[in-house]
Amino acid sequence: MPPLTAPQPATAAHGEVIKAGHVTLDIARLVADIGQGPVPLTRLEFLLLRELAEHPGHSVSKGRLLAAVWGYDFDPGSNVVDVCIRRIRSKLGFELIKTVRGEGYQLVS
């Protein structure tokens, strides 16, 4: 009888990446790379950046980011998206994510 092993958490396929512009996102490791080595991100930072990377060249509204990352509807008084964007910019560079006034945010390619 084979030995019992603890179930392993489900993860993305080994080596699965998303590339958008200068950014490469490693799905399994939750890291981003802009050509200077991997930068670890929190889960929420990674999910937000992934949402932007899946729409390269297009602005993504705060409402869409809130729904995709946090799972709730847009609250005009919430600054959670702004704070997360600021943290990503501080880790990966301020020029990476463009603020599109009146629309949302865009990953610069």
Please name every model-derived segment.
Residues 1-19:
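Basic, amphipathic DNA-recognition helix from helix-turn-helix-like DNA-binding domains
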Residues 18-46, 106-109:
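A structural micro-motif at secondary-structure boundaries
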Residues 27, 62, 102:
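Catalytic-loop Lys-Pro-X-Asn motif of eukaryotic-like protein kinases
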Residues 12, 18, 41-43, 92, ...:
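A generic fold-level signal
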Residues 96-109:
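A short linear beta-strand->loop->alpha-helix hinge motif most characteristic
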Residues 31-43, 47-84, 90-95:
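Positively charged, aromatic-enriched patches within helix-turn-helix-type DNA-binding elements
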Residues 21, 56, 103:
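Glycine/small-residue-rich pyrophosphate-binding loop that anchors the diphosphate of NDP-sugar donors
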